[in-house]
């Protein structure tokens, strides 16, 4: 009996990454979502618990992406203007190296948080094709906006309606 329980436990543990990836891969507009673990470029993990009740903007970008280079300064200004109202911006770099992402963040002087893509995050990104890709999660954890394109300033300012 103990051996059977042990085997079932080991099987469940071995399937956990697959289950976690499957959950993130199914993000659809209107769903309540939970972002996967993310380690920021500074080595700190994102603690999602204190962010409950905030509006979260998640963005995928790459340092080579000209659309991201135009969108990110606008997104950063928007973040600075609305952070006190409960806005959090967390971005995920698709760069091959953390060094390239760190240089991009430093050069842009961005204040939003950034991490590197992982297999769990990659499943979310691969739902759509193109950069930048932006998701907005409302205060209740519901996915309320998905954009796969360069957002102009008016588009980004419109995110304030979720605050």
Protein language model regions, located:
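A short beta-strand-turn-helix
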Residues: 36-55
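N-proximal helix/coil linker or "cap" segments that precede and/or mark the start of modular domains
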Residues: 16-35, 103
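Conserved segment of the thioredoxin-like fold in thiol-based oxidoreductases
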Residues: 80-118
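Conserved redox-active cysteine motifs that mediate thiol-disulfide chemistry
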Residues: 60-77
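Bacterial N-terminal signal peptides
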Residues: 9-17
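Hydrophobic beta-strand anchors of alpha/beta hydrolase catalytic cores
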Residues: 57-58, 89
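N-terminal export leaders
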Residues: 3-7
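Thiol/disulfide oxidoreductase modules built on the thioredoxin-like
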Residues: 106-110, 118-159
């Amino acid at each position: 009996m103990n051996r059977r329980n042990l085997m079932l436990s080991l099987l469940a543990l071995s399937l956990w990454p697959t289950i976690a990836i499957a959950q993130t891969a199914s993000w659809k507009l209107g769903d309540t979502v939970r972002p996967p673990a993310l380690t920021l470029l500074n080595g700190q993990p994102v603690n999602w618990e204190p962010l409950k009740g905030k509006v979260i903007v998640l963005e995928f970008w790459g340092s080579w992406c000209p659309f991201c280079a135009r969108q990110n300064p606008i997104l950063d200004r928007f973040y600075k203007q609305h952070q006190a109202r409960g806005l959090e911006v967390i971005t995920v770099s698709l760069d091959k190296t953390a060094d390239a992402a760190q240089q991009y963040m430093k050069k842009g002087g961005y204040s939003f948080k950034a991490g590197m893509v992982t297999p769990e995050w990659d499943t979310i990104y691969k739902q759509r094709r193109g950069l930048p890709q932006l998701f907005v999660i409302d205060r209740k954890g519901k996915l309320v906006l998905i954009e796969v394109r360069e957002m102009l300033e008016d588009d980004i300012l419109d995110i304030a309606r979720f605050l």
